[in-house]
Amino acid sequence: LALAPAFGVDLAVDVAETDPNQALRAAIGTKADVVVDVTAKAPAALGQAVSLARPGGTIVLAGTRGSLETPGFDPDHIVYKELRILGALGVDVAAYRQALDLLVTGRYPFADLPRQVAGFDDLEPLIQVMAGDRPGTPPIHGVFAPDARSNNKGPAT
């Protein structure tokens, strides 16, 4: 989260430690115009997104729940608040092209993000941690390099 401002984030909150509604209210005194949810396997995030959005606001869902249950989510609030909900699946060729174009601009410090490099021996555990199927903190940047011999954690070099 410490790197979030370098990527243009106005407010980044670890919801495991801080109530996002209180943090948003303290930061801007109102609800958000746009809430972007990119969490994976976080069923409660949808309810939080609806709570954080202002009436007439927009919620972008780019993370999948991994569950049919959504604790704290009341669909009626979408109607009452007249929210716009957009789904975003960013795993097509056009999205990869845009991502690569953004990387080469140097606009954001991607090289400073913590990463983990995995070879064939470490790939399965890395994918399991990133999918939430194995205990551990998933890296922000997971890299498969067939010739990698060990895990590298920390900023990219």
Regions found by a protein language model. Give the residues of each.
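Glycine-rich nucleotide phosphate-binding loop and flanking beta-alpha elements
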Residues: D19, A42-P43, S67-L68, D92, ...
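Helix-to-beta-strand junctions that scaffold the AdoMet/dcAdoMet cofactor pocket
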Residues: A53-P55
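Adenosine-nucleotide cofactor-binding segment
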Residues: L1-Q48
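Short strand-turn motif at the edge of the Rossmann-like AdoMet-binding core
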Residues: T39, G63-G66, A88-V91
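Short, glycine/polar-rich helix-capping loops at beta-to-alpha or helix-loop-helix junctions
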Residues: L1-L3, L68-P75
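C-terminal hydrophobic helical "lid"/dimerization subdomain
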Residues: G47-S51, D92-T157
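Rossmann-fold dehydrogenase core element
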Residues: T58-V60, G72-L113
